[in-house]
Amino acid sequence: MKLKALLKTLSIATAISLAGTNAATAAADRDYILATASTGGTYYPVGVALATLSKVKLEPKHKFSLSAISSAGSGENVKLLGENEAQFAILQGLYGAWAWNGEGKLKQAGAQKELRSVSMLWQNVEHFVILSDMAKTGTVDDLKSMKDKKFSIGKKNSGTEGSGRQIMSGLGVDPDTFNLAYLGYGASADALQNGTIDGMNIPAGVPVSAVTRAYASMGDKIRILNFTDEQMKEANGGYNLWTRFVIDANTYPGQTEAVNTIAQPNFLAARSDLNEEDVYLLTKTIYENLAFLNGIHKATKAMSLQKAIDGLPVPLHPGAARYYKEQGIEIPAHLIAD
């Protein structure tokens, strides 16, 4: 009897222990990792804003949240998602397209078909700025006449260089025929002002301080090039990534006319195997609390439900798609997951 009692006691204790372990594991699994970028950019503070929102609005009632971590940016984030070291990540749209198709800088890793979209966050607006006397058409066709001209395409191996090359390739422009400079945004603006370069490519949220500075100094001596609808299609190269963006007149000093340019999304990505209900609740919470996010970081002021799926490069996670359908948003075929 004593042995039976002892075995029964041990059995109960083991069951309790295992139950506790499983519960702890389940709880840990619902503290999702959100990969961002370096702490000095926009990705990290926006990631912290999303994580803070989840801890305030979702953790108390629904028992899950996000924790933001810094990273080397979009390229590493795709790797972290693929290895399940992160369950959510902020990605540049082009890197999302490259990951999904196994192309570009991510070709070696192969197609990442476990990748899903949750929401567009804010857009990188393309500013192809050149000297006005070189802007004969006022559109990106003028880039075709810039052979041997000095042009800053962004820092080497940066997202700026990657997106610039992608766009120009679609337009039939070979940037390697330019006299290229590999400068950051501020340095590009300085070089344009002092005559070291004739043009620059700056994709960022509007208004961009570097472009503001260049316009304040040079006024109508420089011009942001327009994209026609056909040029937007060519720039996309089949990606459905860049969408129309109008820079209103007087956004920059001396910019008296609106500019019809294009923009690609920075977007919230997720693994396809994440719990549908969790992704649904996160998406719903984001759009019901935009004012909360706006108070933490100004980049989120560009977010709106009307723009939530603009330019997304990979199919939506079913949880996000469910929320958008509830809100009456029509989801195009290429964003519906198999």
Region locations from a protein language model:
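A structural signal for short loop-to-beta-strand junctions that line the ligand-binding cleft
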Residues: 108-127, 251-259
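An extracytoplasmic/periplasmic, membrane-proximal ligand-sensing/linker region
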Residues: 187, 204-219, 224, 274-338
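Pocket-flanking alpha-helical
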Residues: 56, 67-109, 186-191, 206-215, ...
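C-terminal lobe and pocket-closing loops
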Residues: 216, 222-281, 323, 327, ...
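Alpha-to-beta junction loops
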Residues: 82-90, 149-151, 194-202, 218-222
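Bacterial N-terminal signal peptides that target proteins for export
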Residues: 1-11
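Bilobed "Venus flytrap"/periplasmic-binding protein-like clamshell domains
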Residues: 31-60, 68, 124-194, 306, ...
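C-terminal segment of classical bacterial N-terminal signal peptides
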Residues: 16-25
